[in-house]
Every structure is written in structure tokens, then in C-alpha cells.
């Protein structure tokens, strides 16, 4: 893509959960492994070192049986902001094209507004595929949070 034409993805959702719970759900493997991934996907493995400079790696099996693995490095981890790189692994475990994700958490009374911003897509179809995946993931996330309340 030409410089300056990087398609970005921005999604905003409000959840009936306190920010502290939403933060833990994004930064603790025991929680993230229960919701991260689109509907129909199950977590195969989830490792997270949620601190600036720490790494994560999450493998999930799709409904077709294929395992999809993503990994990255945290750039920032604070109660109101989580920023990390995001890359899919190929069959040999090598990282693919790297993107950047920033999660912002805003307290609204007893609710939390989550804004997800992802940049660095190679093309618009890649962004659109991620939009669909994240939207499905946020449905699972909402159900996970509701079960914790």
C-alpha cells in the first residue's frame, strides 16, 4: 500500500463490568484463554507476560480444526491502556506481517468503554477480515464478563 493509506480498524464497545475486571481479562492467560478468538474457536495454548517488553502467544483451533497462532510484544500495559504488536505465525512458527493494537479502557460508572484500534494492515481486505474476527471476539468477551459478575 502507498504510504499514508494504511487502513485502520477502530471498534468501540461498552461492557457491564468494572475496568479492573476488563483489564485482568485482557492481561491474564487464565481469563484470556476463555474468550479470545471468534465464535467457534477454542484456545489451544495461551502465554502472556503482560508488561512493557513482555511477549504473548495465543494458539486457537478453528471450527475446521486448523490451528491459528498469533503473537506479539506488549509496548504498554497500564490499567487504562494496553498496546501490543500482533502477527500471525506461519506453519513453521515464523511471524508474518506485524500490526499494532491499542486497547483503551475508560470507566463509565460501573461500566467500561473499550476502544480497540488496530493499524498496519497490508490491505483493506485484511482489515475487514480482522473487523469480523474482533466483532465476534467481543461477543465472546461480553459473555465471559457477564459470567464473572
Predicted regions and their residues:
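Hydrophobic/basic alpha-helical segments enriched in Actinobacteria
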Residues: 8-11, 20, 45-46, 64, ...
Amino acid at each position: 500500500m502507498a504510504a499514508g493509506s494504511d487502513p485502520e480498524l477502530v471498534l468501540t464497545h461498552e461492557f457491564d463490568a468494572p475496568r479492573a475486571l476488563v483489564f485482568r481479562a485482557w492481561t491474564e492467560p487464565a481469563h484470556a484463554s476463555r474468550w479470545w478468538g471468534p465464535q467457534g474457536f477454542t484456545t489451544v495454548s495461551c502465554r502472556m507476560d503482560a508488561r512493557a517488553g513482555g511477549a504473548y502467544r495465543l494458539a486457537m483451533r478453528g471450527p475446521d480444526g486448523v490451528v491459528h497462532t498469533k503473537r506479539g510484544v506488549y509496548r504498554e500495559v497500564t490499567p487504562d491502556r494496553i498496546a501490543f504488536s500482533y502477527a500471525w505465525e506461519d506453519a513453521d512458527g515464523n511471524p508474518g506481517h506485524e500490526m499494532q493494537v491499542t486497547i483503551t479502557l475508560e470507566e463509565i460508572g460501573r461500566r467500561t468503554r473499550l476502544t480497540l484500534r488496530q493499524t498496519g494492515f497490508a490491505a483493506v481486505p485484511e482489515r475487514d477480515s480482522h473487523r469480523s474476527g474482533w466483532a465476534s471476539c467481543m461477543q465472546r468477551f461480553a459473555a465471559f464478563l457477564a459470567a464473572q459478575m
